[in-house]
């Protein structure tokens, strides 16, 4: 893989602090690929992901732009302007038909990138793994280093480990380390928050009172909390 620089373009790496985008960024830096900015939008991220961004900031020769997104404001206070819930306060928990937090993250990144580009053509590196190639968006402005190098998710994790990025062991327990309060997370990921980050779990329970939607269509967060309490109690017996 070697990308040619467009003298009239700007090159951005969008990262989350997870294994794939981190492997991509390290690969770009090691191969001295065209790269002007590394950018991330921080919105209810696992601490391990934030620590990865901290570490990248220290070693990267290019600027790392951290866009802060006020998740709590949009969750409970933002006045909805359109649609069925126009006039309501806060989006509440994301649903299958309203993954607003994903859109908010993407829109904040795009807004920042547009400001950085200042009229130049934007080339964006996307950390999609080779075994997730179906997620790729065919666009001349989108670049997929992991796909081009046929690096699968497990390859990416090993690559990060070999470069000293171990995610503090998070991938021994989690499948993903992006948003810790995502309703679409696997139960094992949620249990990790419950058992390892009681402060974040309590924050989720506090947020729950402001949502007009249950955490999941068939289960409230309080019900999940009660289930986790039973599991924790049973584990203490052995």
Where are these regions (language model features)?
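Nucleotide-activated chemistry modules centered on ATP-dependent adenylation/adenylyltransferase
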Residues: 1-238
């Amino acid at each position: 893989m070697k990308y040619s620089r467009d003298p009239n373009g700007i090159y951005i790496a969008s990262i989350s602090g997870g294994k794939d985008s981190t492997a991509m960024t390290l690969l770009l830096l090691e191969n001295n690929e065209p790269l002007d900015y590394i950018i991330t939008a921080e919105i209810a991220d696992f601490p391990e992901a934030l620590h990865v961004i901290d570490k990248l900031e220290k070693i990267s020769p290019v600027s790392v732009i951290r866009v802060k997104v006020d998740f709590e404001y949009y969750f409970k206070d933002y006045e909805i302007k359109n649609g069925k819930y126009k006039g309501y306060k806060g989006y509440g928990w994301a649903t299958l038909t309203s993954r607003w937090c994903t859109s908010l993250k993407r829109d904040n990144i795009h807004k920042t990138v547009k400001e950085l580009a200042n009229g130049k053509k934007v080339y964006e590196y996307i950390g999609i793994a080779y075994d997730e190639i179906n997620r790729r968006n065919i666009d001349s402005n989108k670049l997929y280093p992991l796909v081009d190098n046929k690096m699968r998710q497990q390859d990416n994790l090993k690559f990060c480990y070999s470069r000293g990025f171990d995610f503090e062991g998070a991938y021994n327990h989690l499948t993903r380390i992006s948003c810790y309060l995502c309703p679409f997370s696997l139960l094992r990921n949620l249990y990790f928050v419950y058992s390892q980050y009681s402060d974040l779990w309590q924050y989720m329970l506090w947020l729950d009172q402001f949502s007009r939607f249950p955490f999941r269509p068939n289960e409230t967060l309080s019900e999940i909390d009660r289930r986790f309490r039973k599991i924790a109690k049973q584990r203490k017996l052995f």
